Amino acid sequence: MAKMSIKKILLIVLGVIVIIFIIAGIAGGESKESGSSVSSQEATTKTNTQTANTNSFIKPGMYKVGSEVKAGEYVIEATNNNGYFQVSSDSSGELDSIIVNDNLNKGEFRYIIIKDDDYIKLQNCRMYLSADKTIQPKSLDKIPPSTYKIGKDIPPGEYKLKATTQYAYWERSKNPRDSIYGIIANDNIDDSAYVKVLNGEYFKIVGIEATLVK
């Protein structure tokens, strides 16, 4: 009887060991699967991050120029009617630090030049390198509100402007960084006007529809 009891005990012990190994194997498998899932998620996150950084546009946010985005000329596109961008000399948030800023509606574009150590803030906007983005209106008979680079987006020449909203404004500028000193000519109109623009200028129209005359 004692020998039978020992055998039974040994069998029970062996059974317990086998069960432990089975449980450990299952747990190990789950751990590996879980680890693979995490790695996959990490890889996906890294891929998404790389895609976001190397994609054709820069998402809304605040960036330091030179470390997060390259200096250069960019095109900003509003993704809804509350689009806003701001270029600042520092991150103090003070009005004196603002170099240039503007509001724009969905589908409108603005040009901007940013330099190393600037800060660029994008709200409801996305930003493209100017070389990668051309703003081509469907027709030169009905050019919608935006900022256009003459010779790149629309041809030089004389344009007839027609006010489409109560606030109608046009502006010719030498560059899109100097919000005041870069302006060549500008005006508010109540109904219509003619404006001649030259190659390399930036032509901004707000609440206006433009038509190429010649």
What are these regions (language model features)?
Residues V69-G72, D153-G157:
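Extended extracellular/luminal ectodomain segments enriched in beta-structured repeat modules
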Residues G25-S67, G72-E73:
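N-terminal, intrinsically disordered, polar/charged segments of Gram-positive cell-envelope systems
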Residues I154-Q166:
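Surface-exposed interaction/gating patches
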Residues S5-E30:
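Membrane-embedded alpha-helical segments of small multi-pass membrane proteins
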Residues M1-K3:
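Juxtamembrane low-complexity tails/linkers enriched in Ser/Thr-Pro and polybasic
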Residues T51, N55-S56, T79-S139, T165-K214:
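Primarily secretory-pathway and cell-envelope proteins
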Residues S139-L140, P145:
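Short, surface-exposed polybasic-aromatic patches that bind anionic ligands, especially phosphate groups
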